[in-house]
């Protein structure tokens, strides 16, 4: 919570704004001294306004006038265990309505879209970094991204909130405007490791191989591979498969070397910083092809390659 307000106050004099948290839970984001702050939730035990933020969202529901300067804050619930304020939403039998234009596969994306309807001047909330950096997720944000742009951010580890699998969360500050995916790829995200992350700084394996089942695209098949999503998924999943399956990625001879690269990337994946977890598998294609024979045969050559690939980031290589 402190980091959220530190980020917000760097850009905004918040004293002149009403603060609203539409899924306030234990009111963690409303504990600061402030002249006007409003909390709401669907849980009657919260002691806040009992309002469903995802059904017919409008300012008057919260007693906020149309011309009132407004900032939305908080940690809205999303589809994992790290939404620490609203974990109860998964534990209790809450049944609540969601407007059709707000519905999404992820509850957090529904909340972001609901914020846009309330037209605050700023939005400063925690949510998974994957909402922004995964293009498929970003496209789901249309109602939100067409009216707000990312102004500032800090990437933090989910370990700050939970002991479950680690992944990157972003404390994100948005202002009125619009953004596209190219803006996100250019954005330099500061991290809690004292480093930065920029998608455009890297090349990705998806530019060279198929990540998902591709039976119709591959004729002569020399092997099979487990479907891929991101680096965190690679840590959990297999690489090469001993037998074909309907969901397997088929490997052609000319692409085999890249799947071997992915196999070895899996070995070092736990040693790179958590904030790479939702990215596609990273590669420096020119550098890799230059040493490909040594890379496949010599562990030391692979280690030197990966050290250069992640230079400037706190890795745990031997």
Which stretches of residues belong to each language-model region?
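Conserved acidic residues
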Residues: 17, 70, 121, 166-170
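Short catalytic/ligand-binding loop motif for oxyanion handling, primarily in non-cytosolic enzymes
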Residues: 30, 47, 80-83, 131-135, ...
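C-terminal target-recognition/interaction regions appended to catalytic cores
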Residues: 221-318
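Flexible, glycine-/basic-rich loop-and-beta segments that form/coincide
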Residues: 165-221
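Mobile active-site "lid"/loop adjacent to the S-adenosyl-L-methionine
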Residues: 82-104
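Conserved S-adenosyl-L-methionine
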Residues: 1-71, 130
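Conserved Class I SAM-dependent methyltransferase catalytic core
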Residues: 101-158, 172-173
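Internal, well-ordered alpha/beta segment that forms a basic, Gly-enriched binding/recognition surface
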Residues: 72-86, 108, 114-115, 123-124
């Amino acid at each position: 919570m402190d980091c959220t307000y530190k980020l917000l106050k760097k850009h905004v004099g918040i004293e002149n704004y009403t603060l609203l948290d539409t899924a306030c839970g234990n009111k963690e984001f409303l504990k600061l001294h402030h002249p006007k702050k409003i909390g709401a939730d669907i849980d009657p035990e919260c002691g806040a306004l009992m309002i469903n933020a995802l059904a017919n969202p409008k300012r008057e529901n919260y007693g906020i006038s149309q011309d009132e300067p407004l900032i939305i804050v908080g940690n809205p619930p999303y589809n994992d265990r790290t939404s620490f304020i609203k974990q109860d939403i998964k534990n209790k039998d809450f049944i609540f309505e969601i407007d059709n234009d707000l519905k999404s596969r992820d509850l957090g994306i529904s909340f972001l879209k609901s914020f846009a309807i309330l037209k605050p001047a700023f939005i400063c909330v925690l949510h998974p970094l994957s909402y922004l950096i995964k293009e498929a997720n970003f496209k789901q944000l249309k109602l939100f991204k067409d009216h707000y742009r990312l102004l500032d951010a800090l990437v933090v580890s989910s370990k700050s909130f939970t002991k479950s699998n680690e992944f990157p969360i972003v404390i994100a500050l948005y202002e009125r405007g619009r953004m596209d995916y190219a803006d996100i790829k250019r954005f330099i995200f500061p991290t809690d490791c004292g480093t930065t992350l920029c998608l455009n700084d890297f090349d990705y394996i998806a530019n060279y191989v198929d990540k998902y089942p591709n039976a119709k695209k591959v004729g002569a098949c020399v092997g099979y591979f487990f479907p891929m999503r991101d680096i965190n998924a690679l840590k959990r999943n297999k690489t090469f498969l001993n037998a074909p399956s309907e969901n397997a990625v088929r490997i052609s001879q000319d692409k085999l070397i890249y799947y071997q690269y992915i196999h070895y990337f899996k070995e070092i994946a736990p040693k790179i910083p958590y904030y790479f977890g939702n990215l596609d598998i990273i590669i420096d294609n020119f550098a890799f092809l230059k040493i490909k024979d040594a890379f496949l045969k010599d562990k030391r050559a692979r280690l030197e390659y990966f050290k250069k690939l992640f230079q400037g980031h706190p890795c745990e290589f031997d």
